[in-house]
Amino acid sequence: DSEICVNTSRVERYQIDSNHLSTALFFSVYFPPCYSDMQPDGYPTLYALHGQNFTDEMWIDLGAAEKMDKLILEGEIEPFLMVMPFEEYFFREAEGNQFPLALSEEIIPWVEGNLNVCTKKNCRAIAGISRGASWAVRIGLSEWKDFGSIGAHSLPTFRKDIDALPDWLAAISSGKEPRFYMDTGRFDPEVKT
C-alpha cells in the first residue's frame, strides 16, 4: 500500500534518558512535507543547535519550518529532517560539559534507530547559532567523520577552541573535510564594524 502524501510538515518533541546528563534529553524533530517511513535511503538530517537563553523551539519560533516547507514544496531543496536538541544547562562552561557526548552517543543513535534517516556522513549536518554555533564547530570538527557539513551562524567560539582548531583541522584526512558555512547578521550586537 502506498502512503497518502500530506503536504504539511510537522514538529514532534521527544524525551529520552541520558547516561551523560543528570536529566532527560529533550529534542524536537521537524518532519518535512510528505515524510514517509518508506523513503528509500532515508532522509538527510540537520542537527540544529540553539543559542544561549533559548530552547529547542528557537528554530520553529524563527519560522524555519515554514521556510523549509516552502523550499521543499517548490523543489528548491530536497526534503530533510531537522533535529533540534535542547541544551538545558546552557550557562555551564563548555569544558567538561557532557552535551556533545549526549548528542553523539544518545540523540544521534536514537534518531538513526527510530526515524527514516540516511546514516552516511554526507547525509548528516550540524549547525547552530551563537552558543549552538560554538558547539557545531567543536563537534563537527572534532567528530569530522560523522558530519558532511557544518554551519556556524553568529559564531562566538568557546575560549579554548581557538587553540584546539589547528589540531582539529590537522586530524582531518585530506579530501574528507566537511563543507563549512559561516555567517553573521549585519545587526549582530557582537559584531564590531
Regions found by a protein language model. Give the residues of each.
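Non-catalytic cap/lid and distal C-terminal segments of serine-dependent acyl enzymes
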Residues: D1-T193
